[in-house]
Amino acid sequence: PVPAQQRLGEEALAAGTESLRQRLADDEPIEALVRDRARMVDVVLRRAWALHAGPRGKDVALIAVGGYGRGELHPCSDIDALILLPKSEVAGDHEGIERFLAFLWDIGLEVGHSVRTIDDCQRESAADVSVATTLIEARLLSGPDYLFQAMRRALAQDSVWSSQAFFEAKVAEQQARHHRHHDTAYNLEPNVKTSPGGLRDIQTIGWVAKRHFGAETFDELVDHGFLTAAELRKLRTAQAFLWKVRFALHVITGRREDRLLFDHQIRLARMF
């Protein structure tokens, strides 16, 4: 028989997913759906951590990173988590962590995870801008806040990425990505996430702003004189449209599909 906790987890995820599907059909604001999906996963991960991490779990920080760290999830988005250890000696005790991850797998929630110390985070961020970017958007789910704040301070140092170096690396990354899409936003089957003008470009603005200004929201970019109020409204409108397209693609296909393929275009159009 399926263990009771596993069954409850499966049922909670299924009910939450169906609720989001219905709310999309009812044309609820997409911003609420994207954030509520992240909140739903928060509840599941916190509960699973409390159940399975064991007594040493209280000394370890469970942290949402990447898009999940931003509090933005689509139905089949990547869910990425960092398990932050206070010191390397604890790394040998993986039993509670393994139980936690196995439970998530059993209930059908695939979570990409890394297990690191603060020194690991600092070293790997300095070596790879994609790691630095993922950790910029960290959000504490469970565990000691002092450990989480110590990681944030370590990663904020210019020795990891100065604002200028980070900006240049993200521009180079963007140019390479655009080139893979033939430098055009006008493909007949665009990728709403990675094509020029897609969600990744909007996210890049947020990453650079966070590294340079410490800005947590796009609204703060108006305060810094980086955007006008009119530009902010346009940006939010574009983001909401792309979010709805991506959310609907995941619902229609039941998988992480970000390409606006011909097969989906008519059905998707009827949802707008």
PLM regions: where:
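A nucleotide- and high-energy phosphate-metabolite-utilizing enzyme signature
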Residues: 1-272
